[in-house]
């Protein structure tokens, strides 16, 4: 999908001083993606999405350790609410924990590390550069897997794959740019919103009806997102106001 742009820039998009980080990022991203897709076959989509909500917690901890980011009270509260909502949905100890759950958890761990690496790279490289390296490296790594497991898709499946690729491209460009603009820990509470969308998609497309605990957990998660959104907008207004006062 991004190949025309790469050719248009005469491959200048690959200019970077972080080639090793790009390589490591792709090496971790591929198994994270494969594990995630595998769990979608084993578990309902809203359950897989809920499990992935451990990512914001891991990322926030890693951001403090490796990016020297500070954790403010509102971000912490939003994360606690988001994680609590996830526990309400999963109900560990009440429902059976299958191999699919463990696969989803390991995928989340790998993806958390990928996010931290992305933040480090994003300081110097553009979103399109990060995505270009990801596309090239992951295509190379996937080639060896495809040799043994290739299945020719039919017309409908091919259309779905193209749509998934387009959505994935937009997703990664947006995420990479977000990590460039703000602290990575600030972006994490917003990821909890995906549960709401996943539940809606699961209901209308796959006939997967979310249970009562899924909706209760979703409400808790949404409250956390509202808190962080309100606080960050308020902080931004204060910064703008102070900037105007200084100029005057």
Question: Language-model segments: what does each one mean?
Answer:
Residues 38, 55-77, 196-215:
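C-terminal transmembrane-helix exit sites in multi-pass transporters
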Residues 26, 30-34, 56-61, 86, ...:
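Hydrophobic/small/kink-forming positions within alpha-helical transmembrane segments
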Residues 1-24, 73, 123-125, 136, ...:
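Membrane-interface interhelical linkers
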Residues 74-90, 213-232:
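Hydrophobic transmembrane alpha-helices of multi-pass small-molecule transport proteins
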Residues 96-120, 237-248:
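Glycine-/small-residue-enriched transmembrane alpha-helix faces in small-molecule transporters
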Residues 14-18, 86, 91-113, 147-163, ...:
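Juxtamembrane helix-entry segments on the extracytoplasmic side of multipass membrane proteins
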Residues 16-27, 71-83, 100-105, 124-136, ...:
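Cytoplasmic-side transmembrane-helix entry/capping segments in multi-pass membrane proteins
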Residues 49-54, 121-136, 172-204, 228:
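Helix-helix packing/entry segments at the starts of transmembrane helices
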């Amino acid at each position: 999908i991004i190949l025309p742009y790469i050719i248009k820039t005469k491959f200048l998009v690959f200019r970077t001083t972080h080639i090793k980080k790009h390589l490591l990022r792709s090496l971790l991203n591929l198994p994270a993606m494969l594990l995630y897709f595998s769990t979608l076959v084993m578990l309902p989509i809203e359950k897989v999405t809920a499990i992935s909500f451990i990512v914001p917690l891991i990322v926030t901890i890693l951001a403090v350790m490796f990016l020297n980011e500070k954790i403010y009270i509102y971000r912490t509260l939003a994360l606690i609410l988001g994680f609590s909502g996830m526990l309400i949905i999963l109900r560990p100890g009440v429902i059976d924990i299958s191999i699919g759950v463990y696969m989803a958890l390991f995928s989340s761990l790998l993806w958390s590390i990928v996010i931290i690496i992305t933040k480090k790279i994003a300081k110097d490289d553009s979103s399109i550069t990060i995505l270009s390296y990801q596309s090239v490296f992951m295509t190379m790594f996937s080639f060896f897997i495809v040799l043994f497991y290739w299945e020719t898709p039919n017309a409908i499946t091919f259309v779905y794959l193209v749509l998934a690729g387009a959505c994935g491209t937009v997703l990664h460009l947006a995420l990479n740019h977000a990590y460039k603009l703000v602290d990575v820990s600030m972006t994490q509470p917003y990821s909890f919103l995906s549960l709401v969308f996943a539940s809606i998609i699961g209901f209308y497309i796959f006939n997967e009806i979310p249970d009562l605990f899924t909706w209760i957990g979703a409400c808790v998660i949404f409250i956390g997102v509202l808190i962080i959104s309100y606080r960050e907008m308020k902080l931004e207004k204060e910064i703008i106001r102070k900037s105007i006062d200084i100029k005057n």
